[in-house]
C-alpha cells in the first residue's frame, strides 16, 4: 500500500501535538487561592456567588474545610444550601495567626476540594505564595474571607461577598 509523504508528516505532526498537549496538561496546576472581601451589610452576595461553586465542589469525593473564627456552622444551613453535610468539616475558634498555617497544611494534603478561612489582616507576599504553592500541590481551592464594615468600604474594594453570620448557630 502506498502512502504519501504528506500523510506521514501530518500524522507525525499530530503525534507531536498530542505529546505537547499531554505535557502541558500535566504541568498545568489546578490550585487556586482567592480573596473574597465582603461587606457585612450585604449578606446575599456571598451566597449568590460562592454557593454554586461550593455545591459543585461538593460532588467531588473530597472534603470541604471551613476554618471559622468563632461561629459554628448550622447543620440546617449546610443542608438547606445544598452542601453535602457528610463532606463538610469545620474547625472553629481558630486564632488568625494559625489560620494561614492551617490552610496551607490542609490544602497541601489534597484531601480537601476547598479550604475556606477568615482573616481580618492582609496576607504577606510570603503567606500568599505559600498558600498558592499548597493549593497547586493539593489541586485544591482556597478562599480567604475578609470582612469589611460598611463604613470602611470606600478605602477597600467596592464589591464584596459575605457568608452571613445568621447562618451560624
From Swiss-Prot:
Post-translation changes: Is rapidly cleaved and degraded by the Lon protease once DNA damage is repaired.
Keyword DNA damage: yes
Annotated site residue numbers, Essential for degradation by Lon protease: 169
GO biological process: division septum assembly; DNA repair; negative regulation of cell division; SOS response
Keywords: Cell cycle, Cell division, DNA damage, Septation, SOS response
UniProt cross-references to InterPro entries, sorted A to Z: Cell_div_suppressor_SulA (IPR004596), P-loop_NTPase (IPR027417), SulA_CellDiv_inhibitor (IPR050356), SulA_enterobact (IPR047696)
Region spans: Lon protease binding: 162-169
SUPFAM superfamilies: P-loop containing nucleoside triphosphate hydrolases (SSF52540)
Induction line: By DNA damage, as part of the SOS response.
Subunit structure: Interacts with FtsZ.
Annotated function: Component of the SOS system and an inhibitor of cell division. Accumulation of SulA causes rapid cessation of cell division and the appearance of long, non-septate filaments. In the presence of GTP, binds a polymerization-competent form of FtsZ in a 1:1 ratio, thus inhibiting FtsZ polymerization and therefore preventing it from participating in the assembly of the Z ring. This mechanism prevents the premature segregation of damaged DNA to daughter cells during cell division.
Family: Belongs to the SulA family.
Protein name: Cell division inhibitor SulA
Originating organism: Shigella flexneri
Organism classification: Bacteria, Pseudomonadati, Pseudomonadota, Gammaproteobacteria, Enterobacterales
Amino acid at each position: 500500500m502506498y502512502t504519501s509523504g504528506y500523510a506521514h508528516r501530518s500524522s507525525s505532526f499530530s503525534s507531536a501535538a498530542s505529546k505537547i498537549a499531554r505535557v502541558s496538561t500535566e504541568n498545568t496546576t489546578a490550585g487556586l487561592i482567592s480573596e473574597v472581601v465582603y461587606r457585612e451589610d450585604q449578606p446575599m452576595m456571598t451566597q449568590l456567588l460562592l454557593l454554586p461553586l461550593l455545591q459543585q465542589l461538593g460532588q467531588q469525593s473530597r472534603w470541604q474545610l471551613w476554618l471559622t473564627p468563632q461561629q459554628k456552622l448550622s447543620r440546617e444551613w449546610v443542608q438547606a444550601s445544598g452542601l453535602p453535610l457528610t463532606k463538610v468539616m469545620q474547625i472553629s475558634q481558630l486564632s488568625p495567626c494559625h489560620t494561614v498555617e492551617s490552610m496551607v497544611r490542609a490544602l497541601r494534603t489534597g484531601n480537601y476540594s476547598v479550604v475556606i478561612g477568615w482573616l481580618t489582616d492582609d496576607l504577606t507576599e510570603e503567606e500568599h505564595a505559600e498558600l498558592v504553592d499548597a493549593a497547586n500541590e493539593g489541586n485544591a481551592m482556597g478562599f480567604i474571607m475578609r470582612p469589611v464594615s460598611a463604613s470602611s468600604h470606600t478605602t477597600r474594594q467596592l464589591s464584596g461577598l459575605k457568608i452571613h453570620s445568621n447562618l451560624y448557630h
